[in-house]
Design a protein with these regions (language model features):
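Acidic/His-rich structured neighborhood in mature extracellular/periplasmic domains
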Residues: 85-245, 315, 319
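Sec-exported extracytoplasmic/periplasmic mature domains
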Residues: 50, 69, 73, 123-127, ...
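C-terminal motif of bacterial Sec signal peptides marking the signal peptidase cleavage site
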Residues: 14-17
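C-terminal soluble interaction/assembly domains
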Residues: 266-337
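Sec-dependent signal peptide recognition
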Residues: 2-8
Length: 337
């Protein structure tokens, strides 16, 4: 009889644990399909630019100015500006990249569908904010200083050449580290779109206050990205390889124990910030198999735990600036491996 009682208690604990583990996921499954879909228009500026007759470039570029004002709002009577554009459109490396872009993005129906889904979910949460209805594909020359997705007042800009999956080893050719080029895939576009939406419309936080604050602020952003992309795997949300994701999940408790045990939770040291939040191939303090930005990963787990254990909405969580209240009520207690 005692064995049956103990077994019943154990099963109850397991079921309860599983239910709690899924609660935040349940909150992310919102019913947005009934909302009127915002029309998604995709315009290919790259194709238009690189298709121009370069023998008569000045006249040709003016013909597409009205269709692509976000790129061509300057004075096209300025010979210097025209020559700059012509130089870009005739650059052999840029032409090579554009040829890859045309092949990779020959059909944008799926992209439009994916963007529409992100828009609908965002409008479910924020019905009073209207996102731009035009998305532009363009070639940046794989400029590392330009965000892959940007939101402008009159359009969303997607640097299509940053989503080529290292085709023909193009990212290796320019010396891009593999930990960065692994994120240069079309499956990252809606993740980067959600990130751009967050930074444009939602985020008002100050970072590098202390480690815990940065963890939770990073966790808020990642949870928002997940909310707008509930089907994306954690590896894409975090920007990790599958191997790195496995390591993070397996050693989460050990990482947390090291942070707490070494009194880093409220640290303000720049070196500690770099170790926990800096982008790199791995986190040197742990293992060559570990991913970087483990502070962000822990932050996401804290927010997930907070959403699981508290009856709050996405907006309420994002608007809550009481870092310590979030941490205390999250009941975050990972187990060591």
């Amino acid at each position: 009889m005692r064995k049956i009682f103990v077994l019943t208690i154990l099963l109850s604990l397991i079921v309860t644990s599983c239910q709690n583990d899924k609660t935040y996921k349940n909150k992310l499954q919102v019913h947005y399909e009934h909302l009127d879909p915002q029309e998604i228009i995709i315009k290919d500026y790259a194709k238009a630019l690189f298709s121009l007759d370069t023998a008569n470039f000045a006249d040709e570029i003016r013909k597409i100015q009205n269709e692509f004002p976000v790129f061509l709002e300057g004075d096209l009577n300025d010979i210097g500006a025209v020559n700059y554009l012509k130089g870009f459109a005739t650059d052999t490396f840029c032409i090579r990249i554009n040829n890859m872009v045309e092949k990779k993005f020959s059909n944008n129906n799926k992209l439009a569908k994916d963007i529409k889904s992100v828009y609908q979910i965002f409008n479910y949460y924020y019905p009073n904010i209207t996102l731009p209805d035009v998305t532009y594909l363009y070639v940046s020359g794989i400029d590392p200083n330009i965000p892959s997705v940007m939101i402008m007042p009159n359009g969303i800009l997607i640097s299509a050449d940053k989503y080529l999956e290292n085709e023909n080893s193009i990212y290796d050719y320019i010396g891009m580290p593999r930990y960065l080029s692994q994120r240069c895939r079309p499956s990252y576009i809606t993740r980067d779109l959600a990130k751009a939406i967050y930074s444009t419309y939602i985020d008002n936080k100050q970072y590098q206050k202390d480690v815990l604050t940065d963890m939770i602020n990073a966790g808020k952003e990642l949870y928002f990205i997940e909310a707008l992309n509930p089907s994306l795997p954690d590896s894409i949300i975090m920007g990790y390889s599958s191997k790195q994701m496995t390591w993070a999940e397996e050693y989460e408790g050990d990482v947390w124990a090291a942070i707490v045990g070494n009194n880093m939770l409220y640290a303000k040291n720049a070196e500690i910030f770099r170790s926990l939040f800096g982008d790199a191939p791995f986190t040197q303090a742990f293992s060559n198999d570990s991913p970087a930005r483990l502070g962000e990963y822990i932050g996401l787990q804290i927010i997930r735990s907070y959403m699981t254990n508290n009856d709050v909405s996405l907006q309420e969580m994002l608007n809550n600036n009481d870092i310590h209240q979030i941490f205390q009520t999250s009941q975050y207690k990972p187990r060591k491996s």
